[in-house]
Structures are given as C-alpha cells and as structure tokens.
C-alpha cells in the first residue's frame, strides 16, 4: 500500500476508536465521500447493524439532476438520512466524519442532518 493510503487508514482507525469511547451507546453517523458521490449511514456498533442510510446514488437523488459531488447533493443526503433516522426512532447520534475535514460536503451533510432533527 502507498504511504498515503496507510496514513488515511490509520487516521480512520484512530477516529473510530475515539468515537467508540465517547459514544455512550448512541449510534454512529458515518460519512463516506468519493469524488463523484457522498454516502451516509447510521450504524449501531453494538449490534453491527445499519439503522438508516442515504446516498447521492439513490433514484430520488439522481432524478433531481444533482451530480452527487457538490454541496447541494450533500445537503439533500443529510436531510434524507435524518428523516429516515427519525422515522426509525433515532434522535441522537455520534458524528463520524471518517477522517475527512469538517468542511465542504461533510459539513453541509452534517448541518442538513441537524436541521432535519438529528442531534450531535
């Protein structure tokens, strides 16, 4: 593996470990960002289950004409994920930015999820 990949993998492990310590039984809102799309899941780490998920690749998102690689798509994914999580009875989560900087698409997704009813 290249040095950059190893560094990113270690950063991800470090972030997840600190989140597990501070979670207190709350599910984790995990974000994955690629160059073309953005994905988010609410995960219960104790059971190993995904409770809610949303991505910019879903039919609802693709029909709106967004590319998935911009801030508007991230906001739409955050709103959709929060609606699904609240419907499943989840109000509080721990935000796992996955080693990405809290800026741009990651920040837009988090803000939209907060506005739609999730607290973290």
From Swiss-Prot:
The entry's keywords: Ribonucleoprotein, Ribosomal protein, RNA-binding, rRNA-binding
BP terms from Gene Ontology: translation
GO cellular component: cytosolic large ribosomal subunit
Family matches, as HAMAP family: Ribosomal_uL18_B
Subunit: Part of the 50S ribosomal subunit; part of the 5S rRNA/L5/L18/L25 subcomplex. Contacts the 5S and 23S rRNAs.
Membership in a protein family: Belongs to the universal ribosomal protein uL18 family.
Record's protein name: Large ribosomal subunit protein uL18
Upper taxonomic lineage: Bacteria, Pseudomonadati, Pseudomonadota, Alphaproteobacteria, Hyphomicrobiales
């Amino acid at each position: 593996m290249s040095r950059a990949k190893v560094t990113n993998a270690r950063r991800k492990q470090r972030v997840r470990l600190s989140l597990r310590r501070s979670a207190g039984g709350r599910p984790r809102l995990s974000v994955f960002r690629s160059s073309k799309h953005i994905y988010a899941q609410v995960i219960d780490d104790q059971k190993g289950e995904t409770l809610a998920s949303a991505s910019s690749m879903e039919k609802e998102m693709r029909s709106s004409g967004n590319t998935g690689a911009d801030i508007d798509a991230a906001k739409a994914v955050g709103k959709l994920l929060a609606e699904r999580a609240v419907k499943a009875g989840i109000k509080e989560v721990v935000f796992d930015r996955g080693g990405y900087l809290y800026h741009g698409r990651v920040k837009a997704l988090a803000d939209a999820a907060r506005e739609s009813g999730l607290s973290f």
